Amino acid sequence: MEALIPVINKLQDVFNTVGADIIQLPQIVVVGTQSSGKSSVLESLVGRDLLPRGTGIVTRRPLILQLVHVAPEDKRKTTGEENDPATWKNSRHLSKGVEAEEWGKFLHTKNKLYTDFDEIRQEIENETERISGNNKGVSPEPIHLKIFSPNVVNLTLVDLPGMTKVPVGDQPKDIELQIRELILRFISNPNSIILAVTAANTDMATSEALKISREVDPDGRRTLAVITKLDLMDAGTDAMDVLMGRVIPVKLGIIGVVNRSQLDINNKKSVTDSIRDEYAFLQKKYPSLANRNGTKYLARTLNRLLMHHIRDCLPELKTRINVLAAQYQSLLNSYGEPVDDKSATLLQLITKFATEYCNTIEGTAKYIETSELCGGARICYIFHETFGRTLESVDPLGGLNTIDILTAIRNATGPRPALFVPEVSFELLVKRQIKRLEEPSLRCVELVHEEMQRIIQHCSNYSTQELLRFPKLHDAIVEVVTCLLRKRLPVTNEMVHNLVAIELAYINTKHPDFADACGLMNNNIEEQRRNRLARELPSAVSRDKSSKVPSALAPASQEPSPAASAEADGKLIQESRRETKNAASGGGGVGDAVQEPTTGNWRGMLKTSKAEELLAEEKSKPIPIMPASPQKGHAVNLLDVPVPVARKLSAREQRDCEVIERLIKSYFLIVRKNIQDSVPKAVMHFLVNHVKDTLQSELVGQLYKSSLLDDLLTESEDMAQRRKEAADMLKALQGASQIIAEIRETHLW
């Protein structure tokens, strides 16, 4: 098990070379208040004076101290890493050793070896001032120091700045918060052991070290308490209850030590002498606890705790390193290798982008969105949901009222009163309604164009990671595709405009669907006319027979008798037969007298009997209405524009409006169905499919030129740096994986 700590030290070195903190390695973190004796405990464990000492805040940067045990008989003292597969970055190992029993090495000084521990202390001070300044500033950047000695056990310790309350010197006002966050960053590592240092001449219940330790380790499974300055307690008091755990119990134990005083340091008292005096003090003051306290016992305890902790953390550490190695390998692959054949690389990237673009439209892309519709699926949604619902929301009679229809009918007849509804009025009104379908159709083209623009960004972000290496090539491809889409937009709009113009060019009243609708409406209108005449004709006939009676004396309403109804039906049948005969023979009759070429097609559907004309005439007699009639007392100006007057429509006007409305609605639905079917087809042919078919040839023609190779395949400034960082991290992870793989299972027990 002793071999586990050097393994962790090697892993620490490997990851320090790349400045990575992604792997949390097992280590011992020393925490405590300022001047509580943290650095003195570390020096006692090392057995040499190597840390800066003094009053106030001395430790101003984290110090990661690795203690490496070497055999005393080893005459050739080196870094101990000549045969290690994982070595420090750019390390050139010395061919000769160092003739000294103990030596140190800093990570930031590369291969320089220090045999003078005063020089080590001076280098710590210099490195601290280089980053933290020469006053009282604190920095979170750690200093890495490795000590080789036959007098130490294998340990990895972290000395942190002491907790303080009031800023001094050039320290910021929030120095307490900064140091607290720094300590929490190290002790929050679940693979660390917390060494909580508290001075014996203070109340343990007020220990800041134990308080902050419990925040991250409430169960105390990885916290060991150290009581320093046992020789400085008030006379008549001792730390027996504290060391026995009766005041505050600590699961891993409480160990007391005696530090060198500042006077001892000034008198150059060695650590060896200090440890000997410590043992004598413990035998005298705490004889029953002497064998479970002191610096030597603390070192052995820490070594044992660290080894067991490493054993527990090792399986998870192996898994973590393997996962990270796979991730960085994938990341490095996405960055690609340096370009050798630029011509082949350019053609490959162009082809891949064109393929991914077309696949995104077809729905066979490698990277498929799950949060929203994109590509061909969104185009389908635009066709059948957005465009379809928009067309269905267009009212066939929107913008038309009864006055508009009557005005169109009158304008279509010219100066002659019309007996039938002119076909010209129907065409005029239905074309006006069909024209309203053009705007949503053009909007459909615009939406598809926008989606095809979005596909460019989708392919750049998800499908072709290689393009991120070459930002100029990426911009050039986007520009070419955008120009291609922009060129196809007017062509597609023109085709959609023509589709609507085609419908406007010829109103096909012989359309099969429209003929069926006309037949149904003819039967419906004929039936309504029969019913209306059956109710109203008897009263009109009676008023005609008694024409000498003033109309004002006629009854307001009269129910038709059965005899009158039979008479009305007989007259209606005779009238219909007479009209049919006249229409077939072409002679005599009202229809023959007023027939016009433009209205012949409507006669079968808009037949008007004499009885109905008589009824309309009777209805119009009581209320003679002139359009735009002047008020009494005013002169009539023939140059005035006629103003429509609101009035109750006659039966014929109601019938004409109803016929026109139904015909417009029927024909509009036919045209809308045609537009809903033909516009998506036109968009697919003139825009989507054309871009798919010509995209690659357009890209090759515009970009595949020898004069553009060097410029287009210029990598971004940070791409080379990111590739190098990923390669270094991958190398470190592979080295760490090799180190862990060399651990024998027997080492764990």
UniProtKB/Swiss-Prot annotation:
Region ranges (G3 motif): 159-162
Domain Dynamin-type G per the UniProt entry, residue ranges: 22-315
Subcellular location: Cytoplasm, Cytosol; Golgi apparatus; Endomembrane system; Mitochondrion outer membrane
Record PTM: Phosphorylation/dephosphorylation events on two sites near the GED domain regulate mitochondrial fission. Phosphorylation on Ser-650 by CAMK1 and PKA inhibits the GTPase activity, leading to a defect in mitochondrial fission promoting mitochondrial elongation. Dephosphorylated on this site by PPP3CA which promotes mitochondrial fission. Phosphorylation on Ser-629 by CDK1 and PINK1 activates the GTPase activity and promotes mitochondrial fission. Phosphorylated in a circadian manner at Ser-650.
GO CC annotation: brush border; clathrin-coated pit; cytoplasm; cytosol; endoplasmic reticulum; Golgi apparatus; membrane; microtubule
Positions carrying N6-acetyllysine: 610
CDD domains named among the record's database cross-references: DLP_1
Start and end residues of each stretch annotated as G5 motif: 258-261
SMART domains per UniProt: DYNc, GED
Gene Ontology molecular function: GTP binding; GTP-dependent protein binding; GTPase activity; identical protein binding; lipid binding; microtubule binding; protein homodimerization activity; small GTPase binding
Gene3D superfamilies per record: Dynamin, middle domain, P-loop containing nucleotide triphosphate hydrolases
Annotated positions of the S-nitrosocysteine modification: 657
Pfam families: Dynamin_M (PF01031), Dynamin_N (PF00350), GED (PF02212)
Reactions this protein catalyses: GTP + H2O = GDP + phosphate + H(+)
Region (G4 motif): 228-231
Keywords from the named record: Acetylation, Biological rhythms, Coated pit, Cytoplasm, Cytoplasmic vesicle, Endocytosis, Glycoprotein, Golgi apparatus, GTP-binding, Hydrolase, Isopeptide bond, Lipid-binding, Membrane, Mitochondrion, Mitochondrion outer membrane, Necrosis, Nucleotide-binding, Peroxisome, Phosphoprotein, S-nitrosylation, Synapse, Ubl conjugation
Region (B domain): 515-582
Keyword Electron transport: no
Membrane topology type: Peripheral membrane protein
Binding site for GTP: 32-40, 228-234, 259-262
Interaction with GSK3B, as annotated region: 461-698
Subunit structure: Homotetramer; dimerizes through the N-terminal GTP-middle region of one molecule binding to the GED domain of another DNM1L molecule. Oligomerizes in a GTP-dependent manner to form membrane-associated tubules with a spiral pattern. Interacts with GSK3B and MARCHF5. Interacts (via the GTPase and B domains) with UBE2I; the interaction promotes sumoylation of DNM1L, mainly in its B domain. Interacts with PPP3CA; the interaction dephosphorylates DNM1L and regulates its transition to mitochondria.
Family of this protein: Belongs to the TRAFAC class dynamin-like GTPase superfamily. Dynamin/Fzo/YdjA family.
Protein name, UniProt field: Dynamin-1-like protein
Name of the gene encoding the protein in the UniProt record: DNM1L
